[in-house]
Amino acid sequence: ESTIARNSDWVLPIHAGIEIGVASTKAFLGQLTVLYILCLKLAFVRKDIDENAYTKNISNLKKLPEAIKKCIKRESNLQLMAKEFISAKGSMFLGRGSSFPIALEGALKLKELSYLHAEGYPAGEMKHGPLALIEEGLPVIVIAPRDKYFEKTISNMQEVIARGGKILFITDNKKDSLNENIRFGLRVPHIDNLLSPILLTLPLQMLAYHVALLKNCDVDKPRNLAKSVTVE
């Protein structure tokens, strides 16, 4: 048991086993899952959702392992995407709503594992600064689940395309065909919107892994980082 667990009043273990890699990809996904369960339970206890809704959401959660397996089977697409980063000076990850923190996770993993500069931004804030960074050939990863922000995210993506950015598009949307100006597109299995951040995180982590492999970086022990931080 860790020091922080011993000193805490309440602990929610993620039951994901030992995490060897410093980047903690498994721990992050485990934390998302546990937080989903916590929010679901709180909503039920507070009577914000009824028993039918609670049961339906639990049923959706049980579909997650199979959806993850399908996502992993698309690894070859991510290997092709990874080649786009070899000569890049940096990259940008864009998302709206619940996809914004996923963009931050994708950028962090790329920085940690491949030593390539990357930044995550809210797609809606592009015109307040980040758009100035777009130049010809810059890899821009756009995370666009089929939610209420989808059309606005596509509009932001068009702004990037118009300025020469190289789009790597990740979505769970099955309805629309991928824009011909998208360099690479990856569809993850569609699942309930509350669970989609988990599935959308996975390809970003795998992308960082494959970029690191191409650059001959140690994916388990990145330079200058340690599993346990002992100095503030």
Language-model region placement:
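A SIS-like phosphosugar-recognition module
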Residues: E1-E232
